[in-house]
Amino acid sequence: MRSRSNSGVRLDGYARLVHETILGFQNPVTGLLPASVQKKDAWVRDNVYSILAVWGLGMAYRKNADRDEDKAKAYELEQSVVKLMQGLLHCMMRQVAKVEKFKHTQSTTDCLHAKYDTSTCATVVGDDQWGHLQVDATSIYLLMLAQMTASGLRIISNLDEVAFVQNLVFYIEAAYKVADYGMWERGDKTNQGLPELNGSSVGMAKAALEAIDELDLFGAHGGPKSVIHVLPDEVEHCQSILCSMLPRASPSKEIDAGLLSVISFPAFAVEDADLVTITKSEIINKLQGRYGCCRFIRDGYHCPKEDPTRLHYDPAELKLFENIECEWPVFWTYLILDGIFAEDQVQVQEYREALEGVLIRGKNGIKLLPELYTVPFDKVEEEYRNPHSVDREATGQLPHMWEQSLYILGCLLAEGFLAPGEIDPLNRRFSTSFKPDVVVQVCVLAESQEIKALLSEQGMVVQTVAEVLPIRVMSARVLSQIYVRLGNCKKLSLSGRPYRHIGVLGTSKFYEIRNHTYTFTPQFLDQHHFYLALDNQMIVEMLRTELAYLSSCWRMTGRPTLTFPVTRSMLVEDGDAVDPCILSTLRKLQDGYFAGARVQMSDLSTFQTTSFHTRLSFLDEEHDDSLLEDDEEQEEEEEDKFEDDYNNYGPSGNNQVCYVSKDKFDQYLTQLLHSTTQKCHLPPIQRGQHHVFSAEHTTRDILSFMAQVQGLNVPKSSMYLPVTPLKSKHRRSLNLLDVPHPQHGPHLKQNKVGTFNSVLAADLHLPRDPQGKTDFATLVKQLKECPTLQDQADILYILNTSKGADWLVELSGPGQGGVSVHTLLEELYIQAGACKEWGLIRYISGILRKRVEVLAEACTDLISHHKQLTVGLPPEPRERVITVPLPPEELNTLIYEASGQDISVAVLTQEIMVYLAMYIRSQPALFGDMLRLRIGLIMQVMATELARSLHCSGEEASESLMSLSPFDMKNLLHHILSGKEFGVERSMRPIQSTATSPAISIHEIGHTGATKTERTGIRKLKSEIKQRCSSPSTPSGILSPVGPGPADGQLHWVERQGQWLRRRRLDGAINRVPVGFYQKVWKILQKCHGLSIDGYVLPSSTTREMTAGEIKFAVQVESVLNHVPQPEYRQLLVESVMVLGLVADVDVESIGSIIYVDRILHLANDLFLTDQKSYSAGDYFLEKDPETGICNFFYDSAPSGIYGTMTYLSKAAVTYIQDFLPSSSCIMQ
């Protein structure tokens, strides 16, 4: 008989420890573990963490087996793991209806429960009686399910369970936009049951999605049907949001030790090594104590000052918990594991020794880790005075299984019983490793032989869509519908993946379906749903963005392959050449480098061997019965989404396959790809004919009358008239710069239609019948004789509003069959798109209530980056705030309501929201100092800039804005966001162009704009404000011409006039604040009772609830500032607060009670006027803004300099609070 080796003896010791502290509590029927001896319920998260030590010990026994009984122990331990994981699965499967519902609602009451009955797997508390929505708990289960399956364990046993796990993937893939209660089950740290977006949940979901993608849940015994599929774009959304949050944990927690599980074992979710280091350092520096780490700052759990009789805290109570938060040894176990994976032996040794000091010896010398350490009640005041000086007491659960498990696992790894790769078989630990550059493969296809010939003339050899067979090319919308079948399971009543937009990562793969190869075109090329893809320059811009995105975000094996079809809409107007911007882009692609990405162009067949392939086995032939079975039910639901789905790329072969083949999948595609080739119904416009409407009654009036008949009573000046080539000078339009306040007059009541018909016919001189009502038959006749597309749109708008979209228009004569108004509008939309009539396109889009396909995703991207949105033109209540992600239809309805039924403003709002989302993904630095994005105000600023640069009226500027191409609109928005100086000028269109939209050129003026330091003037004034010098001031040349400059030419003062007013107006409109502004406000509130801004008070009590770095505090400050209607006045108030912040840095305990910031600003303005009058300034220079009482030239003064606004503000601030400052003549630190 062999003697027991030393390693075997050590393993036996750990086995005893595992049985005493973990397995001894496992339920023999369900396999679940109670949270502790006292808490009998089984928490999902705790169970997964607690079983990790058992899993690791089983692998260690199998690896270091001395004899057969060691292999038996390994098997027993592994089966204990399997039993627990299956038990958790059964708990969740009993709530399958919630999984199905949550996919669509993402409601806190429709989610899986966080804990279950240990002995029955039943729920233990009501849906609304616990913070059940904890995405990280479901995610850690899926992550470890993937890791354990990859290690050889067989947990999933049938295809129904596979389908359920696939739906769990859908459940967590929206983690980046789901506010939940987080790993501490409290949500917002006030513990008042408010969910929030948690970095720990987003990171764990991202790790789980990556780990389980393309994993066979049956392991070595599986096949294609047991493989899990994850859409890569959802993973990237999580990655983007996580990186934008860290090191911040959530809006209410500026740091959280729970992030250790995200940046290191088990998730390894962050790919930026520097961000990992920063986050870990923040945790150690701000949260670490002598017994472990606090969970987060001001955590009241088990604190001596916590009231155990109340579930929730009072907001001001949180300050009591600061510096006496409980310390948790569990975070040292994470840091031990982190050191092992990072191969940092010093860190491992340091924290192992630290843990030895907080261990408690149990019976027979068993090492136990307590849940946490708390300050004794009688030593609270001492700890307040000297943090980390008091000896603490162990409390909470003993042993704490989650903690005990990670401790044992760390010991097994540190002592060499396990290698890191054995508990991380999916290699997640290499997430921060170097990744080679990605080469993006681009295949350019021609829609038809004619386009192929045009490209050939330019030296570009491409294939048509038909010539690439047997590879089939389809729209991204088809892929979205195909994925609806994924995870479908009738036995469990699971419908599969909800219909959602597929991103460019998902369309850049080859798909193998029933032994055929498919590739899909990117979503941004879809012209049928929204008009952005009608602008060729915008297509180039979106292609640039998507190529850069692919280059930086592609993580799969093989290379991404982007299929780019050149369609008829990408030709010049007469169709005899490819649009120059498209052509130049194709040439750049040929060069091999575009938008910062390495690019390779070739045929699809060439790329097959180097691309990533996904096999969609859920569409195999055995699923034929379910494939077409539910189509009739889904057809009505999805008809609006897919009726215009397929962009016919010429004789592609798709039609041939779909209509000839008897294969049921091909029949399924036939339904999805129903031809959208529209028969032309509208007669051609009759150029040279008179207008249908008299000159004084145009679209402006029609829109207003239509609004009135619907009981909206919308004022005329808030509506919009699209620009037409024959627009008369007196034709009125939207004036974004002079919008009246919402009116609340009486609505029209009875007999609306009849009243409207008579008023409309009389007032607009429309044809009338003998009863005096509108003669719609004659109006239809006039539709055939319209001289412009605009007039056709006007008539169709009247018909749509008064008769409805389904009303049949008999254009071919009585009895010849009619065409619905909706169909005619769609046809007119296509014609306007062909003519690039952007104002008209937006107008018709509004009539049709078109919605950007990615509208909800754009809104979610902005909100997930901690930005709030407002839609509608200010002020409130017309301006509506969006603080949480909304479903697409609800968001669309809200936008139209906030736009006052002004259809063009509503459409433009969607467009700008999409552009903002594009920029926040690609250039997040643009938004660094902005918290709330007010889209209506941004639109007004854009119109202001056009009016200023083009020297035109507000109405003309508004018309020009509405008629900009999408590319120009996005470009103008970027210049406003960037803060750079730019100019706008009219440019001439090519002679052959028939487009009537204004051609506008936007260009940078150069580096004349001030830097951020110059704009705030803080550096120069920091020393000045600390000295109260009463010597008289001498104004400099504010009113004098600027002398000749050294090298950059001569600038007269008149040329500079308005520069700083404009900059303040821009910064105020987009809510841009200086760096560190909110922290300054927090410091000020520490030394006073509150700040009053424009009549609204920000109380100092907010600092007792919130810390300086919290997003919540910044939102609170913005909620006060946003009551200021004038953006330039708001910006001067911000400058005033920054000056106060410098005063607050002085070593004084108080600077007053409630500080009225407006008074400081007006005092500074008075000082400015006094100086100007002393220099005999004329009345023109002393003129005040009537609304605010501030001198216009004070608005337009530079912040820095001896006579800048900051100088006057500093004098005013010191004067206002001088009673609280030191009595010496100079304030010194």
From Swiss-Prot:
Membrane-spanning intervals of the chain: none
Pathway: Glycan biosynthesis; glycogen metabolism
Notes on activation and inhibition: By phosphorylation of various serine residues and by calcium.
Membrane topology classification: Lipid-anchor
Protein's job: Phosphorylase b kinase catalyzes the phosphorylation of serine in certain substrates, including troponin I. The alpha chain may bind calmodulin.
SUPFAM superfamilies: Six-hairpin glycosidases (SSF48208)
Keywords in alphabetical order: Calmodulin-binding, Carbohydrate metabolism, Cell membrane, Glycogen metabolism, Lipoprotein, Membrane, Phosphoprotein, Prenylation
Primary site of residence: membrane
MF terms (GO), sorted A to Z: calmodulin binding
Gene from which this protein is expressed: phka2
Domain of life of the native organism: Eukaryota
Biased composition (Polar residues): 1028-1037
Record region (Disordered): 625-648, 1024-1050
Protein name: Phosphorylase b kinase regulatory subunit alpha, liver isoform
Pfam family of the protein (one): Glyco_hydro_15
Subcellular locations according to the entry: Cell membrane
